[in-house]
Amino acid sequence: MTNIRKSHPLIKIINESFIDLPAPSNISTWWNFGSLLGVCLILQILTGLFLAMHYTSDTATAFSSVTHICRDVNYGWIIRYMHANGASMFFICLFMHVGRGMYYGSHTFSETWNVGILLLFTVMATAFMGYVLPWGQMSFWGATVITNLLSAIPYIGTDLVEWIWGGFSVDKATLTRFFAFHFILPFIIAALAAVHLLFLHETGSNNPLGLTSDSDKIPFHPYYTIKDILGLLLLILMLMILVLFSPDLLGDPDNYTPANPLNTPPHIKPEWYFLFAYAILRSIPNKLGGVMALVLSILILAIVPLLHTSKQRGMMFRPLSQCLFWLLVADLLTLTWIGGQPVEYPFITIGQLASILYFFTILILMPISGMIENRLLKW
């Protein structure tokens, strides 16, 4: 009798994706982040569902309902903080996952890579709208500032902003629609993740050497299921340390003040995972230019495959490109720091230099280093 795992129409799909999947024998811990992102998404959907049962998307009661969740709902505080800090874990895994893709040349799987970029944009949009929901000072002013950026679009900008707001300012209509979008988007993310996985399994996974591994494959289960569980335990450990010991470490104190349209906070800044893009936005004095730079800071990932000049796939054996990659990582950390600083000297200058370096490294230095390495190897 055929094993039900291999014959049942539905279980067969799961089997071919997670159990009998042929995987390269040498993929490292950097390949763990895909499964960790799946776990983060499930965690966010579950905690979000329980929060939505008690949350009210009305400007008069939103802030109070979040307080009510933390004070009166059974274990509401832990659900709320797991959701808030789970988003931070989600982005840590996302950045690691994208970084690994760039380092090991996974962007040569163009369909998988492009769906991944779409996923990144969707997750960022979801996180932004989620930040607005508690209706604290930073929620309100963050929503006002970021949505206002769309007014920089020529001709249709102002109409577009008012259409998104549902009025002439960020108000009840804005909060209600942001809640609706924040609820539906994670399910769209889950569907996109399935497409992402589908495209990946068409080609098979990349590996640290960047070579074809068809001649040396091992089953995903038990080897990589066990390996992924180790990563999962470390992720849960980090999350729970954050939630139980310093849940507000990554938040903003201003968000514990109810939203007040008449009082602007001294420094409006988004959550830490958007600070690098926010720093790039602020480094350009022109509004439209800043918005374009902001979008391009993420969209630039789409042209990374076109800028791949090296005849080797990954950076495993390319020291020059490795140096540039870690320069880029250091640059992004600098931008993250600058995004949280006030707009004054010397932070403005540092931000502008770091923004120029970000685009210069990806668009010019990395393709040149690939060509130099080809020449050094006489290829």
From Swiss-Prot:
GO terms for molecular function: metal ion binding; ubiquinol-cytochrome-c reductase activity. Component of the ubiquinol-cytochrome c reductase complex (complex III or cytochrome b-c1 complex) that is part of the mitochondrial respiratory chain. The b-c1 complex mediates electron transfer from ubiquinol to cytochrome c. Contributes to the generation of a proton gradient across the mitochondrial membrane that is then used for ATP synthesis. The lineage of its organism: Eukaryota, Metazoa, Chordata, Craniata, Vertebrata. Changing I368V: In strain: Isolate SMG-7470. Keywords: Electron transport, Heme, Iron, Membrane, Metal-binding, Mitochondrion, Mitochondrion inner membrane, Respiratory chain, Transmembrane, Transmembrane helix, Transport, Ubiquinone. Heme 1 (or BL or b562) is low-potential and absorbs at about 562 nm, and heme 2 (or BH or b566) is high-potential and absorbs at about 566 nm. Belongs to the cytochrome b family. It is a multi-pass membrane protein. The cytochrome bc1 complex contains 11 subunits: 3 respiratory subunits (MT-CYB, CYC1 and UQCRFS1), 2 core proteins (UQCRC1 and UQCRC2) and 6 low-molecular weight proteins (UQCRH/QCR6, UQCRB/QCR7, UQCRQ/QCR8, UQCR10/QCR9, UQCR11/QCR10 and a cleavage product of UQCRFS1). This cytochrome bc1 complex then forms a dimer. This is Cytochrome b.
